[in-house]
Amino acid sequence: MLIVADDLSGAADCAIGFANAGRRTVVALGADEAVEAANDAAADRVAVIALDTDSRRLAPADAASRAAQAWRALGGTQGANASAGVGVGTSQRRLYKKIDSTLRGNWVAEVAALQPLAGLAIVAPAFPATGRTVRDGRVFVRGVPLGETETWQLEHAGKTADLQPMLEEAGLRTALFAVEPMRDLQPDLLAQALAEHARAGVQALIVDAQSEADLNLIARATLVLREVLHEAFFWVGSGGLARELAALPELFGNDAPAPVAPLRREGPILTLVGSLSAVSGAQCALLRERTGMAELVVPPAVLRNVDSHPESAQWRAAIGAPLAAGSDLLVRIGRDDAFDPSEGAHLSTALAALVEPHVCHLAGLIATGGETARAMLSQAGIGSLELLSEVEPGVAVAQPSDDVRRLTVVTKAGAFGSDHALYGAWLHLRGLQEATRNGSQADSQRAAHASRAPETNSPLN
């Protein structure tokens, strides 16, 4: 299985279902790491590869090119047409194009580039476990139309959030597919209905899904579509459909490689938050309330010119001091009147540069926002991750593939997760969940006390 994602947290939250199902799963941050993982897959050492193309902020044409190149290089396609980039080839590997459940990024251009190579795009971005559903080709976030949400208004104000016109604008022939009236059908009959759309020339089939049961039905039908009807297609979805696929034992052989065992670590935990969403803000507030850990809010003005700003050295030292002393720390990007969503990658890279000298002290890293996680791992020289488990849906736990850093990493998309997501991640890394289940309050209190440090928001106070 090859998962092609446009950011790191998305790659992880999509692929984690396969690790949970007992399949060894690697997230690669670049082409070289992905090729190495593909070689491991060919040698039956890896079952699932999730490649972060880092294309969310690129121009649509560049993002499309990266997605197509990834499939050509890693898809295992056979035949002259596939190798020439013309027509649909026969692939030894299944393709899952991961998209954001709130439709951020260049996913339309990427799907349009992949469709001629991989066949029918089965588009199902619903993720009911996180409140994302699809009805009549429209995404809803906890019952609210996507176009009316904070996330959409922040990044896409004035643009349509409906799936069908978005895909048709890219030149794809589309159709809507409602699962609700077909819920009583067996997967083989549902697969026949899917195949009819493919044979009618549909290039992107938009699938409604209100529940995990709907996604499970689609997952089972698509296996029939491939294995029995031999239709060429690829999945386009979020972590929701991926989890249902991962739960199907027939997707992999019985001898598929299993995940590696996690290694226990001791030391401070850094929570790094690049997202400015209200969701992340609430998660940070609860984390501080429950743990009492120190928080540093780095001004964007420092990050915009981190190499030359006169206060950069002070911020770097302020980040390092509590970590060197063994205390946990929350660091996040501030917001000012000059804020522009397009500068997110630059600010995240600058923040990672301030943190990098202190990574050696860390036992755990919690990174919120795909750009933030990728920037921090790149600065630390980590090119791929082995997925281990998850704290809650969409919050993945991993460790570096080579484990040179001896670091446990938790990744989460910014506007994602419950209010307890960051606190739950911290508890997971501290090992408090097991202690709490066993009623060991003394252990919990000792671990919590170890995280406390004097509260501060600026090294300049």
Model segments located where?
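N-terminal basic/disordered segments at the start of proteins
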Residues: 1-44, 124-129
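Short beta-strand segments
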Residues: 4, 50-52, 97-98, 122-127, ...
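Short acidic, glycine/serine/threonine-rich loops at helix termini
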Residues: 14-16, 106-110, 132-140, 189, ...
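Cap/lid and interdomain-hinge subdomains that line or gate substrate/regulatory clefts
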Residues: 24-28, 60-63, 68-79, 90-95, ...
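Short, structured active-site "lid" loops
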Residues: 44-63
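Conserved, well-structured core segments that form the ligand-binding/active-site neighborhood
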Residues: 140-314
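C-terminal structural cap/anchor segments
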Residues: 322-373
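Conserved, well-ordered active-site substructure
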Residues: 368-424
